[in-house]
Amino acid sequence: MEKLFEWVINHDEISVLCCPSFKVINTIKKLDIKVHNINYDINYRDMPNVICNDFVFDNVRLKECVLHYNCEKTYPVGKMHTGIFILRGDDKEHNGDCNPIRSIDKLVEDNNIKKVFESFTARIKNYNHYYVYGTNI
């Protein structure tokens, strides 16, 4: 997880998509980075500092750098937005995962990443988490 924050600190402002962990959001804020916390889950609609919109279907303006924390749950953001991406997806295959992630290559291909700055895989709780930092510009 530290690597994720190493990537985030390269940016002054970031759109964070589908991150259920307020610990992650608050850590990014403590790094003095402006966070646009966007989550489509209606359970977050009354929470302060959460933009409760679906970035796929609603008119949501994303920042140049986008951290998508649950790529397996949505349409690939890189097919709709041009910029710098920090992408995380896992192969746990939860009910409702419409975009299963089984490799770094899948994240790269789905999001039209032209240049990968860094990537890694972490095994946590008997399944893999895939991370990519790159751009489709």
Where are the model-predicted features located?
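C-terminal substrate-binding/active-site "lid" region of AdoMet-derived donor-dependent transferases
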Residues: 74-132
